[in-house]
Amino acid sequence: MRKIEREMIQAIIDRSYFKKANTKVTVVVPKGADSKAEMRVYLHDNHIATYTDDGQLFVNHCGWETVTTKSRLNSLINFVADPTKNGIYQKNYKWFITRNGVDYQMPQGWHQV
């Protein structure tokens, strides 16, 4: 895991704003009594992940199927889920997401881990 990814995850743990180079973490508290805070992760100003107060992680490559995007998303997945059964990988130029040991093709859009 890269240093910037460790710092990104620490910001999520601390529930604090973080910005370094091309990576940013923000805290969003929606209005409403039952609303839960979210930690949002951005890469080059693209919203690539949301981590909720109840431990849910949603990921999105935003059309940027790059090594850096995959690395940021995998570090988040490893933070919240078993890395031996969950993650993102590329095969024959296509992205796949593994959830609980099952592989799925990963089209653009949001995916819950």
Per-range role (PLM):
Residues 1-113:
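Terminal leader/tail segments of proteins
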